[in-house]
C-alpha cells in the first residue's frame, strides 16, 4: 500500500492490529494511554479493572497503529471473569502483533508461562514489554530479559515505563518494522471505535473502583441510559445506572446521606468534562440486579457478550 508524497514519490504505508496482553495489573492500560498521549482506558490499582477490549488508534505519516487493550488473563471462576479471559485470548489470533506486558521488577511469574505457551501456539509475532523499569535498578533487567528470552523467541524485548513514557518511542519504531503493508482503516481524527456512552460508563466505573472496596467494584456494572448533547448550551446531559448484586452493596454505593454516590458523580463529571471538552450534567441511579455476574442474560444486557 503506497501513498504519494508531495514530490510525487510513492511512500509505503503500513497498518495493523496490535494486541496488548498479560496478567492483571501489569500496566497494559497505562501503556495504551501512554502510546496515545491521552487517557482512554481507565486505570486503577485494582486487578481486573479492564473488562472489555478497548481499541486505541495512533496515526503516523506512514502508518496506522491500531492497539487493542485487553482484560488481564487470570484464573476465572464466574461467567463474567470467563468472558473477560476469552475476550483477551481471542486477541491472540486477531492481531498482527502481540505485546506481552510483564513487570520488570519481578522474576518470571508462573502465570506468565501459560500465556507464553499460547503465544507459541498462535504463531503471531510477539514482543515482550518489560514495564515499570522506573521502579527497578538497571542491573536487575538483563537477567530477567535472558530468562524470558529462554522461554520464547520474542521478536523484540523492550524495557519501558508506561507511566513516564520511557521506551515508548523505541517501541513504536520497532513496531513499524514489523507492521504489514496495508490501508488506513480509520480516519485521522478517530482515536477509538468505542462509543461515547461506553467511555462515559467506564469513567463512572473507574470512580467506583477507586472509591469502594472488597467485592463492591467487581459487583458493579454501569449502564448509560441517556447521552444527550445540548449544543446551544455547550452541555452534555448524561443519565447512568450503577447496577449491583445486593441491597447491601447498593447502600454502600449510595453512602450515608448519599455522600458516596455524590463523590462518585463529582469525580466522574470532572473527568468527563476534560475528556469531552464540554460541560457535563450527570445524574446517577443505583439498582440491584441480583447475581448479575453469573447471569448470561444480564451479562449480555450490560455489554459483556458471550
From Swiss-Prot:
Localization (cell): Cytoplasm; Cell inner membrane
Similarity annotation: Belongs to the TRAFAC class TrmE-Era-EngA-EngB-Septin-like GTPase superfamily. Era GTPase family.
Region spans: G2: 48-52
InterPro entries cross-referenced by the UniProt entry: G_ERA_dom, GTP-bd, GTPase_Era-like, KH_dom-like_a/b, KH_dom_type_2, KH_sf_prok-type, P-loop_NTPase, Small_GTP-bd
Principal cellular location given in the protein's record: cytoplasm
Keyword set, alphabetical order: Cell inner membrane, Cell membrane, Cytoplasm, GTP-binding, Membrane, Nucleotide-binding, Ribosome biogenesis, RNA-binding, rRNA-binding
Membrane disposition: Peripheral membrane protein
Residue sites binding GTP per the record: 22-29, 69-73, 131-134
Assembly and interaction partners: Monomer.
CDD domains: Era (cd04163), KH-II_Era (cd22534)
GO MF assignments: GTP binding; GTPase activity; ribosomal small subunit binding; small ribosomal subunit rRNA binding
Span of domain Era-type G: 14-181
Region of interest: G3: 69-72
Stretch list, region G5: 160-162
Region listing for G1, in residue ranges: 22-29
Function text: An essential GTPase that binds both GDP and GTP, with rapid nucleotide exchange. Plays a role in 16S rRNA processing and 30S ribosomal subunit biogenesis and possibly also in cell cycle regulation and energy metabolism.
Any one of the GO BP annotations: ribosomal small subunit assembly
Protein name per UniProt: GTPase Era
Domain KH type-2 per the UniProt entry, residue ranges: 212-290
Pfam families recorded: KH_2, MMR_HSR1
Amino acid at each position: 500500500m503506497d501513498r504519494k508524497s508531495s514530490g510525487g514519490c510513492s511512500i509505503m504505508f503500513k497498518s495493523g492490529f496490535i494486541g496488548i496482553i498479560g496478567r492483571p495489573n501489569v500496566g497494559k492500560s497505562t501503556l495504551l494511554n501512554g502510546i496515545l498521549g491521552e487517557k482512554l482506558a481507565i486505570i486503577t490499582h485494582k486487578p481486573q479493572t479492564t473488562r472489555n477490549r478497548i481499541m486505541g488508534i495512533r496515526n503516523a505519516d506512514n502508518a496506522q497503529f491500531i492497539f487493542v487493550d485487553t482484560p488481564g488473563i487470570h484464573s476465572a471462576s464466574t461467567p463474567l471473569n470467563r468472558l473477560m479471559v476469552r475476550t483477551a485470548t481471542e486477541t491472540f489470533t486477531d492481531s498482527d502483533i502481540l505485546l506481552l506486558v510483564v513487570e520488570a521488577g519481578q522474576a518470571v511469574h508462573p502465570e506468565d508461562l501459560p500465556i507464553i505457551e499460547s503465544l507459541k501456539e498462535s504463531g503471531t509475532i510477539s514482543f515482550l514489554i518489560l514495564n515499570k523499569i522506573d521502579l527497578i535498578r538497571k542491573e536487575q533487567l538483563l537477567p530477567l530479559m535472558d530468562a524470558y528470552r529462554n522461554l520464547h523467541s520474542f521478536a523484540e524485548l523492550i524495557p519501558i515505563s508506561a507511566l513516564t513514557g520511557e521506551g515508548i518511542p523505541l517501541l513504536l519504531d520497532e513496531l513499524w518494522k514489523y507492521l504489514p503493508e496495508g490501508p488506513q482503516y480509520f480516519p485521522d481524527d478517530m482515536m477509538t471505535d468505542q462509543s461515547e456512552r461506553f467511555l462515559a460508563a467506564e469513567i463512572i466505573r473507574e470512580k467506583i473502583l477507586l472509591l469502594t472496596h472488597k467485592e463492591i467494584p467487581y459487583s458493579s456494572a454501569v449502564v448509560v441510559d441517556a447521552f444527550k448533547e445540548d449544543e446551544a448550551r455547550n452541555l452534555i446531559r448524561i443519565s447512568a445506572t450503577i447496577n449491583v448484586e445486593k441491597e447491601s452493596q447498593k447502600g454502600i454505593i449510595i453512602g450515608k446521606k448519599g455522600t458516596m454516590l455524590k463523590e462518585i458523580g463529582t469525580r466522574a463529571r470532572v473527568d468527563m468534562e476534560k475528556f469531552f471538552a464540554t460541560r457535563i450534567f450527570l445524574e446517577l441511579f443505583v439498582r440491584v440486579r441480583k447475581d448479575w455476574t453469573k447471569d448470561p442474560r444480564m451479562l449480555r444486557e450490560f455489554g459483556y457478550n458471550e
